[in-house]
Every structure is written in C-alpha cells, then in structure tokens.
From Swiss-Prot:
Protein name stated in the entry: Large ribosomal subunit protein uL5
HAMAP family: Ribosomal_uL5_B (MF_01333_B)
GO molecular function terms attached to this record: rRNA binding; structural constituent of ribosome; tRNA binding
GO biological process: translation
Record GO cellular component, one term: ribosome
Family classification: Belongs to the universal ribosomal protein uL5 family.
Keywords, sorted A to Z: Ribonucleoprotein, Ribosomal protein, RNA-binding, rRNA-binding, tRNA-binding
Gene that encodes the chain: rplE
Function: This is one of the proteins that bind and probably mediate the attachment of the 5S RNA into the large ribosomal subunit, where it forms part of the central protuberance. In the 70S ribosome it contacts protein S13 of the 30S subunit (bridge B1b), connecting the 2 subunits; this bridge is implicated in subunit movement. Contacts the P site tRNA; the 5S rRNA and some of its associated proteins might help stabilize positioning of ribosome-bound tRNAs.
Assembly and binders: Part of the 50S ribosomal subunit; part of the 5S rRNA/L5/L18/L25 subcomplex. Contacts the 5S rRNA and the P site tRNA. Forms a bridge to the 30S subunit in the 70S ribosome.
Matches recorded under InterPro entries: Ribosomal_uL5 (IPR002132), Ribosomal_uL5_bac-type (IPR020930), Ribosomal_uL5_C (IPR031309), Ribosomal_uL5_dom_sf (IPR022803), Ribosomal_uL5_N (IPR031310)
A Pfam entry, by short name: Ribosomal_L5
C-alpha cells in the first residue's frame, strides 16, 4: 500500500477534530473535506504558435504530475480570432493522493517563491465553499526550469470542497496550511 500524503494524514488527525469542535458537527460525514483541485491554464496564442500549446501541456504535466486535457473553444469568436474546436487551454483535475501532494507543494514550495508574498487573499470564495486562486507566473513551481520557458503565463487553481459555507471552507483550507490574509490585514505596499 502506498504512503499516505502528509496533508491527508494532517487532515485526518488534526483538521477534522478541530472542525468538529469549532462548528459542532454531530455526524462525522458533516465535516467538510477537500474534494478536488482543478488547475486551469489558458493558451491564447495557439492560432499563431502550436508550440505554445505543447509547452503548456508539458509544463502542466510537470507541475501536477498528471497529463492535462486540452480545452477547446465551444463557439467561434471573431474578435479574438478563435474558431470553434480550436484549443484554448489546458486543464487538470486532481483528486485523492495527488491532490494532497499538489496542495502541499503549492503551500510549502511554490507560494513562498512569489516576490513580496504576504499571503493569499480571502476574497475569492464563491459563496458555496469553493476557493479560486490566480497565479501570475508558472515559474514559481520548482518543477519548471526558468531557462526553458518561452512565455510566462499564469493559471487558475480552484479548491473544491463539500463545505456548506465559505467560513467552513476557510477553516478547512486554513487548517491544511493555506496562508490566508484576512481583509484589512494586508500591509500597505511600500513605495
């Protein structure tokens, strides 16, 4: 049997009991859990450069450890020079052990690599317990070799939980180590 990821063990041993005490759950199935992490990256210049899509697929595979699916345009949009069926991005959905391992690497290795990092904002909850984090550069991940990157792109990372409210989801992600900064706690940027 494979080893249990560190964060999954932390969830079972520390976070679940803490959430049960904090929110007064009676049934153990009521305790919120992280269901999946979706990592999405748009590739805008595919019409001119097929290599951009190949590089995005390879970088996403290195970052997540899983081969991404290519997302295609649902309809043509002339102003963006996009035709129906044209590849527009790549997406990976992580679950179970890979999800916890990615979350661990994101929090402990990647996020601290961001310049002037003070924490992630707590404003990106959707009202149903899911949290979305936008990252500006893929080079914060240690798996990406900066010398081989042609174009710096960002990505969206969505943490899908089965929590009923944003407060429960906030407590869950905070317990797993997400470095949140509460509104008003941000230090002003120095000029």
């Amino acid at each position: 049997m494979a080893d249990v990821p560190r964060l999954q063990k932390q969830y079972q041993d520390e976070v679940r009991p803490s959430l049960t005490d904090q929110f007064g759950y009676e049934n153990p199935m009521e305790v919120p859990r992280l269901e999946k992490i979706c990592v999405n990256r748009g590739v805008g210049e595919v019409s001119e450069n097929q290599k951009a899509l190949d590089q995005a697929v390879e970088e996403m595979r290195k970052i997540t450890g899983q081969h991404p699916t290519i997302r295609r345009a649902k309809r043509s949009i002339a102003s963006f020079d996009v035709r129906e069926g044209m590849p527009v991005g790549v997406k990976v959905t992580l679950r179970e052990a890979r999800m916890y391992e990615f979350f661990d690497r994101l929090v402990t290795l990647a996020l601290p690599n961001i310049r002037d990092f003070r924490g992630v904002p707590d404003r990106s909850f959707d009202g149903r317990g899911n949290y979305t984090l936008g990252i500006d550069e893929q080079i914060i991940f240690p798996e990406i070799d900066v010398d081989n990157v042609d174009r710096i792109d960002g990505m969206d990372i969505t943490f899908v939980t089965d929590a009923e409210t944003d407060e429960e989801s906030y407590a869950l992600l905070k317990g797993l180590g997400m470095p949140f900064v509460r509104r008003g706690d941000e230090e002003p940027a120095e000029a």
